[in-house]
Amino acid sequence: LVWYAARKAGKKGSDTAAFRKVIQHYLPEQTDLLCAQYQLSLLKRSENWKDYLPKALAFADKFCQEDWQRLNDIAATLSEQYTTKDTHEKALKMALRSVDLHSVYDNYDTAAQLYFQLNDLTNAKVFAEKAIAAGKAAGTTTTATESLLQKIISAK
């Protein structure tokens, strides 16, 4: 819907004012959430990691404490795009909250990755094993997590 409206107006999908207008019209009760998420998606798409981090942290705090999917998505992005211990600790907090809300392969895998990046090999192993078990139970490919588990075991 938004993409269609932007295309009709000759925009390329980065007009935040046009996005807000469409959202206010069709989903007024979700305007703040969806506009903030849209801004994050623009930063992610343009790989503007300097501006992404503070906005992602604020977005997670304000909108995502009960949303396991968004929390895990942000935590995974922070894990992949940042190298600082402080950022990984914040991402781990999100990943663990996501696991608390809904324990599935992706959430366990993100937590395992973050524990590994933080050099907490004991918890990394626990969460990698949980990820593999959850993935296999759901019929999900777990090859990446199995590879991580081998790295964890080798690093111990």
Where do the PLM segments sit?
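Oxidative protein folding and maturation machinery
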Residues: 1-156
